[in-house]
Amino acid sequence: MKLKNTLGFAIGSIIAATSFGALAQGQGAVEGELFYKKQYNDSVKHIEDGFNPGARIGYFLTDDLSLNLSYDKTNHTRSNDGTGSQKIGGDTSSLTAQYHFGQAGVDSLRPYVEGGFGHQSRGNVKADGHSGRDQSTLAIAGAGVKYYFTNNVYARAGVEADYALDNGKWDYSALVGLGVNFGGNAGAAAPAPTPAPAPEPTPEPEAPVAQVVRVELDVKFDFDKSVVKPNSYGDVKNLADFMAQYPATNVEVAGHTDSIGPDAYNQKLSQRRADRVKQVLVKDGVAPSRITAVGYGESRPVADNATEAGRAVNRRVEASVEAQAQ
């Protein structure tokens, strides 16, 4: 009858567990389990091997490590000391830690090892020459495997070795269990795949930086003269060719003198020099409308008029033209 009640409770637990969507494995999970243990007792105790039903509850400190409280009851076990069959009763409670291997999840196998301590109490036991109630403190070691039917329902099979610290005797057991777990995080979730970065927009082609080209003209004159000397024709021709290449350009031809002589005279002399250079440009193909000839007299010296060398530099016609390179 007790076995039927145990099975009924186990089946009810499974149905309840599968009805809670929040149940899971992993850190923070609580496991509840019903198990049945086959106990192989040390021969010195004169106790037949028996079957012990029990229950266990565990809490996962991490995804792999759980702390467990277990309780099982010794039923239907008898002495075999030759003095008559005596019914043996008692129980065992224990605190153990289980370390699991493998990944939690549906249809997964998780081997485990465990260790801890327990307390065992049995009545009508003859052990090492005495009888009565036997109390033992146990060191427990075990191993096994869990199979998870779902994230919440599992079956367990394992073996345990119990060492009695009081008398140095060993007992062994094999067990099977059926359990459920509640809560937890089902292990570390796989990180969501990093979305592919959006393609960089194709940069608009940069407008090419306009390159400025420039040509300059510097024609020198003899004292009190306005005649363009032959050695300057090439420079004037370069300016004319540049303006032909860039037909949108115009030019100012600026005439200058040194400081010798009256201002009014030098003003007229500088204008004549500018006009002469304009005439050469026109001969080289530049339209007159694109040329402005201006005389500045002695007002814009670029060198010292106190020396002959400086005055020679100041007797000049200047021009410069800029354009954007094609």
Curated annotation (Swiss-Prot):
GO terms for cellular component: cell outer membrane; pore complex. It is found in: Cell outer membrane. Residues 1-24 form the signal peptide. Disulfide bonds: none annotated. The keyword DNA damage does not apply. Residues 208-325 form the OmpA-like domain. Transmembrane segments: none annotated. Residues 190-205 are annotated as: 8 X 2 AA tandem repeats of X-P. Its main location: membrane. Keywords: Cell outer membrane, Ion transport, Membrane, Porin, Repeat, Signal, Transmembrane, Transmembrane beta strand, Transport. GO terms for biological process: monoatomic ion transport. This is Outer membrane porin F.
